[in-house]
Amino acid sequence: MELENYKQPVVLREDNCRRRRRMKPRSAAASLSSMELIPIEFVLPTSQRKCKSPETALLHVAGHGNVEQMKAQVWLRALETSVAADFYHRLGPHHFLLLYQKKGQWYEIYDKYQVVQTLDCLRYWKATHRSPGQIHLVQRHPPSEESQAFQRQLTALIGYDVTDVSNVHDDELEFTRRGLVTPRMAEVASRDPKLYAMHPWVTSKPLPEYLWKKIANNCIFIVIHRSTTSQTIKVSPDDTPGAILQSFFTKMAKKKSLMDIPESQSEQDFVLRVCGRDEYLVGETPIKNFQWVRHCLKNGEEIHVVLDTPPDPALDEVRKEEWPLVDDCTGVTGYHEQLTIHGKDHESVFTVSLWDCDRKFRVKIRGIDIPVLPRNTDLTVFVEANIQHGQQVLCQRRTSPKPFTEEVLWNVWLEFSIKIKDLPKGALLNLQIYCGKAPALSSKASAESPSSESKGKVQLLYYVNLLLIDHRFLLRRGEYVLHMWQISGKGEDQGSFNADKLTSATNPDKENSMSISILLDNYCHPIALPKHQPTPDPEGDRVRAEMPNQLRKQLEAIIATDPLNPLTAEDKELLWHFRYESLKHPKAYPKLFSSVKWGQQEIVAKTYQLLARREVWDQSALDVGLTMQLLDCNFSDENVRAIAVQKLESLEDDDVLHYLLQLVQAVKFEPYHDSALARFLLKRGLRNKRIGHFLFWFLRSEIAQSRHYQQRFAVILEAYLRGCGTAMLHDFTQQVQVIEMLQKVTLDIKSLSAEKYDVSSQVISQLKQKLENLQNSQLPESFRVPYDPGLKAGALAIEKCKVMASKKKPLWLEFKCADPTALSNETIGIIFKHGDDLRQDMLILQILRIMESIWETESLDLCLLPYGCISTGDKIGMIEIVKDATTIAKIQQSTVGNTGAFKDEVLNHWLKEKSPTEEKFQAAVERFVYSCAGYCVATFVLGIGDRHNDNIMITETGNLFHIDFGHILGNYKSFLGINKERVPFVLTPDFLFVMGTSGKKTSPHFQKFQDICVKAYLALRHHTNLLIILFSMMLMTGMPQLTSKEDIEYIRDALTVGKNEEDAKKYFLDQIEVCRDKGWTVQFNWFLHLVLGIKQGEKHSA
């Protein structure tokens, strides 16, 4: 019987296996390439009788078989022929590993389902002309006690046990752990041990013009300290640290004893380290490109460094890898020609191509089981099943509604419109449980997409996803019982639903969660999605030649729109039809790949043909916003995401730090644990300790707060910790210990003072007692400050510690600096918070830093103060206390009490009091003008609401700054039913008074304020797309204030997208006038805040 490809499915279900065995191949010739026998010599773990050399077995292995069958074949041969047959009788095939050598490294053939002919070792042997190649059969041994102890240490640091597989339905977690060994080892082997130990924080961006102006006569003065003496030297901004050391030693040749330098030592034995910080000035970078040097120039501070011995690179030793490497071919299937069933003896088929499966995909919904029924028993329930790829729903079906009881059974097959062969990698089977009142649901709509009418009357209760193509490229089959996620009610957790609903993890709380039982078609053999073979696209040249001018203009207009502009069906059709033209414009890529119909295998093949011809993309300059767009939730295809990651490889370390928060969040949008993005983050973290430090905390915070992605973040963090080195592991252990101890203290203090705002003397006394107990027993002698790894905190200054008067009872803690080279006795102030999710504050502060870097390119210094803030766990975190700063509220109250909110001159008088000379006062006013302009523009563009006099602060040098970013993008609070935000930003009469103006009058300072605002505003408009994309990515990731596209629209409106520069300038100047007109309303709000004690934010929370 011969099959006709277009008439019936080639891959038949289990009940038709007998029929398949009777099928004959169409032709023997067609099957030769994938049916060949491959000679392999297997080296066995047992020795020959007469000598100690190991036994070997030469086998001819079927190329189309899989690794599991090959291992069984070797084991059977060993049973038959080995002199130690008893050994093989005791141990089954699963007790052995298959290893081969490549370029001096041992690799494990790890994936038992991999087709033999796709193994990397075969390609290697062919390239090196080895026949037969050798594979070693090695006995698998249990992990050593030392190894288990190390794993326990890692589990404590991660906050999750990656070896616990009780909540997984496949081996993807273990597969990823093994897969990440290779990039980890490669990065550790290639990094410079000396540079890694000292992790210099540098940038290659040009020095801004405003900083050049602070360098007189092209000279920078550096004070070099050694023991109790110091020496000031004059250097050029272009001198490298090495040249500076050489110059210094030449100058001090005859005075070494003065600086406590042994005569035998030279500049080669020393490095420059910043006084009081673990920050080194080393390498071949000009001194002007070190971030600390720029920080000092910007703030008018002297540059103090200590002459120090370099740290020992041996302290960064990485524990010897216990696992053999796995090659990049692991988990990869063959080409369709190798896997297809056509033309083959079906008795010999072991793995079948997905593209042979011509029938429609279907799923059997057996039923659901719920531990606790809803209170309202008069409800009906149905299951909606979607197949989606990214945000694209490929098809949708649903069951009929049934009465909502503890167990609801359907036992019904839902057949989808998509064929099995068209299922793309990364496609999710999304199952959702809806309920509603009986009349609202009509059984007539069974198995169809719910109408908008019926959808409006029902409520989504539970959901779960299953990846239809697993991490091995194999189609899922058989029975699954999936524990579902419940939809959060009102509250902060609701904001994370957009991201959570993409997870393929199941609910670990099996006892208390809804479960759904489903059945997928079972097959005689694994069904594998083939690798795509790049082939020319015959349509390409014809389409390129046919583009009329009118359509070209239309295409260019589509490409020019911003990321929020929705694409119509006609737009998508045009982009796809002229895809080769679109390919020439990197800005078109997100729109082009949004136009792909991912549920059609032929279209996907053509998309990969496009990706193979992306020379313009590869050669274009890096546009971070554009590249990050390809990493958002709209793109699930790993090849599309990989070209974005490849582009990010050129980011320098400082920029990786700028975007690290978003990149970590973007990992949630990956369909699989192992991805190009996960590997990029791993490599950059292992290359630079500063990046590694923040990667650790960003991942650990997500593991603690996001159950939906715990496993994914945990497996990446484990891979990082296995390669970061002993010194970093020690640092992280100390930090985690400190946080766990302080968390316990905070919980104890909160239990004593309940929900009150005031703090009794008894509570303060208890705090000091608990801190003393910690200090005397468990607290580490020193630890790196999580939000600033250059700082090491030492002993607590207990007399300065207190409980802050607010609902969540944060601790105000002060630590002594642990570094003996610190020049002052200033403490390190940290607010330890429990009960608030600081991730949104982190987002805003990070965007402020990006705004600063945008302004720097236009030589604007807006004196922003993005203080340190980091989430270290589930609603736990640390905030930096800014020195010599106080809230506007405190200044207003300190003079005339609550009515200070209406006294325009109070702030100006306070600044005068803090300025010892007129010159210092004028400098403070200047700084106030710039910082006020910076925060006016930033808070307006970001829609930062809930601004009151307790969350606006000022330093004694006039630097205004905002804190507590709980309300963004226009999500403003109301008071007594009235929206409190009546002005675009805060520019009150007392602020204007500092600038020398009032009412509608003007002044030189106010004129400068307006000019700065306009320049800063227009500079941000040039980066509208970047700001939109950064926020769009966070839209899906658990920010309670970011839940819809409308939220992001706020930024678009604020930046006046579509207006010309002149109109935009007028628009912002109009906003300033609105503030001048309505400044009294803000003063009135501030008065209410002082009188009624409206606690919207923590006092002094920065």
Swiss-Prot record:
GO cellular component terms, alphabetically, are: cytoplasm; cytosol; membrane; phosphatidylinositol 3-kinase complex, class IA; phosphatidylinositol 3-kinase complex, class IB; plasma membrane
User: What residue stretches are annotated with the PI3K-RBD domain?
Assistant: 217-309
Q: Which GO terms describe its molecular function?
A: 1-phosphatidylinositol-3-kinase activity; 1-phosphatidylinositol-4,5-bisphosphate 3-kinase activity; 1-phosphatidylinositol-4-phosphate 3-kinase activity; ATP binding; ephrin receptor binding; identical protein binding; protein kinase activity; protein serine kinase activity
The PIK helical domain sits at 541-723
> Post-translation: what modifications?
Autophosphorylation at Ser-1101 has no effect on the phosphatidylinositol-4,5-bisphosphate 3-kinase activity.
**Tissue occurrence:** Pancreas, skeletal muscle, liver and heart.
Outcome (variant: K833R): Loss of kinase activity. Loss of autophosphorylation. Reduced inflammatory reactions but no alterations in cardiac contractility
EC annotation from Swiss-Prot or TrEMBL: 2.7.1.137, 2.7.1.153, 2.7.1.154, 2.7.11.1
Alphabetic keyword roster: Angiogenesis, ATP-binding, Cell membrane, Chemotaxis, Cytoplasm, Disease variant, Endocytosis, Immunity, Inflammatory response, Kinase, Lipid metabolism, Membrane, Nucleotide-binding, Phosphoprotein, Serine/threonine-protein kinase, Transferase
Region entry Catalytic loop: which residue ranges?
943-951
Q: Which disease is it linked to?
A: Immunodeficiency 97 with autoinflammation: An autosomal recessive disorder with variable features. Affected individuals have childhood-onset antibody defects, cytopenias, and T lymphocytic pneumonitis and colitis. Some patients may have features of hemophagocytic lymphohistiocytosis.
Q: What is this protein called?
A: Phosphatidylinositol 4,5-bisphosphate 3-kinase catalytic subunit gamma isoform
Q: Which gene encodes it?
A: PIK3CG
